[in-house]
Every structure is written in structure tokens, then in C-alpha cells.
């Protein structure tokens, strides 16, 4: 199974997020401090997302077309890791959202509307991951196990 996740929408979104956050770490004041805290909790989490949450999602278009091939079995390792790591990923989201709320508050107080908007969008992004992407990633594995006759 060949997937190049370097050009996925989610990877592109993560790169843009990192660039915006890097700008916020140079904003000065409480906004800068809050942005650094977001950075500390966010980047290890994003790495794990891109390592085992996102690759299964790349199969969704093929699976939606009814394509299931034996080489897709290789993704099951990642979906099992995702299933095991889900509680940790959700706990990390709580820490990330807490840090983002501090960034939102600081940026608003200091007149950095762009960074405040960025923080709000990231909070919504985390919610979307929890409600849609993480479950979908796990479901890819469960679906493949059924279709490939794996238990």
C-alpha cells in the first residue's frame, strides 16, 4: 500500500497551523507566553497524529469506492495503535484546548485579533478530530479487519 501523506489536506493544515503558531510566539507579552505553552503541548501531539491517526484516513476514498486489497492490511498496526492511544490523545486535547483558551484570552486582551481567531479555529479543529477523524481512523481498521477476515 502506497500513501504519500506529505500532501494531504490535514498535513497541509498542520503545517499552516505551525506557521501561525510560530508567528504568535513572537507577538510579545502574554500572547507570546501563551503561544509557547500551546507549542509545548501541541507539537508532540501533532507528531503522533501524523504517525498513526492520519495514515488510515488516506484509505477512505478507496474504501468508499468499495476497494479493499490485501496490501491494506499493513495499516492495521496503525489503527490498533490509534485505538490504544485514543485515551491519551483525548487527554492531550484537553491540555491543548486549555492552552489555546489562554492564548485566546491573552490575544484578545492584547488586541491580537488574528491570533485570537487562530486559537478559536484550533479549538474547533480539536473538536472535529475528536468527533470525526479519530473515530474514522479507528473504523478504517475495524472495517478492514472484517473485509480481510482478520480478528
Q: What is the predicted role of each segment?
A:
Residues 1-151:
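Small-residue-biased structural context
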Amino acid at each position: 500500500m502506497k500513501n504519500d501523506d506529505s500532501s494531504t489536506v490535514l498535513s497541509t493544515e498542520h503545517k499552516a497551523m505551525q506557521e501561525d503558531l510560530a508567528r504568535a510566539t513572537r507577538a510579545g507579552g502574554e500572547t507570546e507566553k501563551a503561544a509557547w505553552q500551546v507549542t509545548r503541548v501541541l507539537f508532540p501531539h501533532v507528531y503522533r497524529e501524523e504517525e498513526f491517526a492520519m495514515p488510515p484516513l488516506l484509505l477512505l476514498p478507496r474504501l468508499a469506492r468499495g476497494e479493499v486489497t490485501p496490501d491494506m492490511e499493513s495499516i492495521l498496526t496503525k489503527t490498533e495503535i490509534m485505538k490504544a492511544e485514543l485515551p491519551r490523545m483525548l487527554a492531550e486535547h484537553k491540555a491543548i484546548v486549555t492552552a489555546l483558551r489562554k492564548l485566546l484570552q491573552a490575544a484578545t486582551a492584547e488586541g491580537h485579533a488574528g491570533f485570537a481567531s487562530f486559537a478559536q479555529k484550533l479549538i474547533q479543529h480539536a473538536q472535529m478530530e475528536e468527533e470525526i477523524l479519530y473515530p474514522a481512523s479507528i473504523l478504517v481498521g475495524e472495517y478492514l479487519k472484517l473485509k480481510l477476515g482478520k480478528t
